[in-house]
Regions:
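Glycine/Thr-rich beta-alpha phosphate-binding loop at enzyme active sites
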Residues: 36-41, 79-81, 102, 119-141, ...
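Active-site glycine- and acidic-residue-rich loops that bind
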Residues: 153-160
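Glycine-rich phosphate-binding active-site loops on the catalytic face of alpha/beta enzymes
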Residues: 89-95, 128-138, 172-194
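Catalytic beta/alpha-barrel core
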Residues: 15-17, 38-45, 62-70, 83-91, ...
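Conserved N-terminal beta1-alpha1 strand-loop-helix module at the mouth
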Residues: 1-81, 101, 161-162, 169, ...
Length: 205
């Protein structure tokens, strides 16, 4: 599935950091019960790729991606683990080329007009605006609209329930990303019921 098509299926992408592999399936089941089926697992912990493999095998109805990719080997490992999309914090042309070679949906992060222009040249039309709040928030995002009318974004970083609706009203926003539907303290408490409640709220933004 093309990344733009994938992002169009959701209002919010939960960005998850898995510390305990045993939390993976109940956490994802809780998110899915709330209506969120596109999930990003960050490549920041040792269990991350095992978690992706587990999700792809046990919960195939979830579109699981791997985030925090820094080099082509990260992308290759993500695909081999069963990821259906890849996310990076910045724009890396080696990653772009590897994703195209492997036919893996790829969402690179950008902040500036120069980065947007480079992404555009490589045929990328869906981008991650990251870190959204630090990069100017909604005001910063608005600056891309008149210059790049066919670019669309998934703003991520510093977004929560209070400002997500405002981002989603922008015509160049496909969805938002963040951890506000699955806070780390609720994961540590294994409070899946509360995570489902938050996921339901996020899915209806």
């Amino acid at each position: 599935m093309h990344i733009k098509e994938l992002l169009s299926t959701t209002r919010m992408i939960p960005v998850l950091t898995i510390n305990n592999l045993n939390d993976t399936l109940p956490l994802c089941a809780a998110l899915m019960a709330g209506g969120l089926s596109v999930i990003e697992i960050t490549l920041r912990t040792k269990p991350a790729l095992n978690a992706v493999e587990m999700i792809s095998k046990e919960l195939p109805e979830i579109n699981v991606g791997v985030g925090t990719l820094l080099d082509p080997m990260d992308l290759i490992r993500a695909k081999n683990s069963g990821a259906c999309f890849a996310v990076s914090p910045g724009l890396n042309m080696d990653l772009v080329e590897q994703a195209q070679k492997d036919n893996l949906a790829y969402l690179p992060g950008i902040q500036t007009s120069s980065e947007a222009m480079t992404a555009y040249r490589y045929g990328l039309r869906a981008l991650k605006f990251f870190p959204a709040k630090a990069a100017g928030g909604i005001y910063g995002l608005k600056q891309f609209q008149p210059v790049y009318p066919d670019l669309e974004f998934c703003p991520t970083g510093g977004i929560d329930f209070s400002d997500a609706p405002e981002y989603l009203r922008e015509r160049n926003v496909l969805c938002v990303g963040g951890s506000f539907a699955s806070p780390s303290d609720l994961i540590e408490q294994q409070n899946w019921k509360e995570i489902t409640r938050l996921a339901t709220m996020a899915a209806s933004l």
